[in-house]
Amino acid sequence: SVTYRTHPAPPVTAAFLVANTSTEEGRLQLFKEWVKIHPDIMDAGSAGFWPYSGTQFFLTLMAMGNPPTNPKATATLQGFYDKIATIPGVSIDLEVTKPYTGFQQWYDDNFIHSQNGIGFNYTIGDFSGVPAAVSSVLIPRTSFKTNTDDLAVALAELTDARPFLVGGGVVSKVDPDAMAVNPAFRSMLSDITIALSWNVTTATPQEVHAVEQTVTDWANGIRDVTKSPGAYVNEAEILIPNFQEAYWGNHYPRLRAFKQSIDPNDLLIVRQGVNSEGWDDEIMCKTL
């Protein structure tokens, strides 16, 4: 038998923005304002996606309730819109607030049936089924609060990224020791994902490695500011500098001890997995 626990599906209010920048200075100022208000957006009850590509900056955010249960949600976002509208070289091409009956309707309209979507087209804008090098950086709340300008510069240096405002709130209240993986989630606000693909039919191994190195170099630009190696293990980076701390933080020594005790011969081993530092990159030969 199976027991299901069900929950009500409350309505949600979604906010969509498309901003376009015509100058590098305007683009940088937009990022500075976004970084500055980032913690306030989360504290006011909004979460979601803020992809950007080339000259365009998008928001696809969602708050619980219709109207939002947090009375600051709408006003906080409007304050950001009003601020960036005054920046020379920045134009707001789309600004929409729309209620949905629940998360499922919002998801179906914007991720499944793209003809109903608003703003960034996730069906087209996010590629799948192609080889790609991926990186993830979990950006702590402290970076948004104390390294505002440096973080904005690092973000603006990326032409294309898919960040997710999914931290804070209840996420930050969970004991980081409650699970083995990703303790950095408890102090982060946004997870920025960077990806770059290659031609599967023509790329040489050297060219593939160059793509992987480029993605790591881009991610390092963010990590240099955050001083935090935290990364999302489901968006694993092939050349990540310190996978032990990135994925498991201070849990790693204990996890490695467990692994060595349970599997002393490394029968089960994967690249960048626990206790894999004693193997070569192809997990073919032991190096320690």
Where in the sequence are the language-model features?
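Soluble FAD-dependent oxygen oxidases
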Residues: 1-288
